[in-house]
Swiss-Prot record:
Record bears the keyword Iron: no
One annotated GO molecular function: metalloaminopeptidase activity
Protein name, UniProt field: Methionine aminopeptidase
Positions with a binding annotation for substrate: 62, 161
Cofactor comment text: Binds 2 divalent metal cations per subunit. Has a high-affinity and a low affinity metal-binding site. The true nature of the physiological cofactor is under debate. The enzyme is active with cobalt, zinc, manganese or divalent iron ions. Most likely, methionine aminopeptidases function as mononuclear Fe(2+)-metalloproteases under physiological conditions, and the catalytically relevant metal-binding site has been assigned to the histidine-containing high-affinity site.
Annotated Gene Ontology cellular component terms: cytoplasm
Native source organism of the sequence: Pyrococcus horikoshii (strain ATCC 700860 / DSM 12428 / JCM 9974 / NBRC 100139 / OT-3)
Length: 295
């Protein structure tokens, strides 16, 4: 593990997150904001570890704009900005919620305090369910619900989701014990809704999983490009727009997804249409505490 690269990725992620918050004003287009976030990451010496996720209101995650997207920010929107930076595969993952044109409110505070509470109990030897308990308590005591089917995640080199989850609720069977040197993203989501997300179209983010035989020449071309440029990290539909006509691109991606070569991440929406907030940091677990790389 290269701690220096993890720390540097975290510094870039923090800076870009803070700049993105200042840019999130009424009338700004999601496309413009996403492109600024991603190009700024590169300017500062990193690469996007995944597409900028810009999810509004009842959409909790996995929305990234496409070329031609007309969505603009409106006053009162809850905008989740979730961005990732990697240096040589060493990842920092961070998120913040902005209430566009308005002040910080209780729903935002619930997710932010939940994150801080979870970080304060994290250290080597602690079971992840204790972090889930801390998150759930902070959100529920403010009268909101944690989103039960979204969670934080272990991070490894070139692997955004490395198999272990940090739940946003207390679950007795979540007994993975944090180890010194583990890298985790902790990301509480709070909602005014039921506390559950469902998958809805469209799918705007994909990830390479494995090689698989596909007939379509365009699909083979696309797969080679994806492996070369993004390796095992998520990428945006938008990043491939312009590679071939739109209809062919959609067909090629569908064919690659069906074959198991790619995994698609549909947009995630709160099941009852409740408003959703999110805050996230990346931590390196130490013996008696953690290092927060994105703070």
């Amino acid at each position: 593990m290269d701690v220096d690269k993890l720390i540097e990725a975290g510094k870039i992620a923090k800076k870009v997150r803070e700049e993105a918050v200042k840019l999130a004003k009424p009338g700004v287009s999601l496309l413009e904001l996403a492109e600024k976030i991603e190009s700024r990451i590169v300017e500062l010496g990193g690469k996007p570890a995944f597409p900028a996720n810009l999810s509004l209101n009842e959409v909790a995650a996995h929305y990234t704009p496409y070329k031609g997207d007309q969505t603009v920010l409106k006053e009162g929107d809850y905008l989740k900005i979730d961005l990732g930076v990697h240096i040589d595969g060493y990842i920092a993952d961070t998120a913040v919620t902005v209430r566009v044109g308005m002040d910080f409110d209780e729903l935002m505070e619930a997710a932010k305090e939940a994150l801080e509470s979870a970080i304060s109990v994290a250290r080597a030897g602690v079971e992840v369910k204790e972090l889930g308990k801390a998150i759930e308590n902070e959100i529920r005591k403010r009268g909101f619900n944690p989103i039960v089917n979204l969670s934080g995640h272990k991070i490894e080199r070139y692997k955004l989701h490395a198999g272990v989850s940090i739940p946003n609720i207390y679950r007795p069977h979540d007994n993975y014990v944090l180890q010194e040197g583990d890298v985790f993203a902790i990301e509480p989501f709070a909602t005014t809704g039921a506390g559950q997300v469902i998958e809805v179209p469209p799918t705007l983010i994909y990830m390479y999983v494995r090689d698989a035989p596909v007939r379509m020449a365009q699909a083979r071309f696309l797969l080679a490009k994806i492996k070369r440029e993004y390796k095992t990290l998520p990428f945006a539909y938008r990043w491939l727009q312009g590679e071939m006509p739109e209809g062919q691109l959609k067909l090629a991606l569908r064919s690659l997804e069906r074959s198991g070569a790619l995994y698609g991440y549909p947009v995630l929406r709160e099941i009852r249409g409740g408003m959703v907030t999110q805050f996230e940091h990346t931590i390196i677990v130490e013996k008696d505490s953690v290092t927060v790389t994105t703070e």
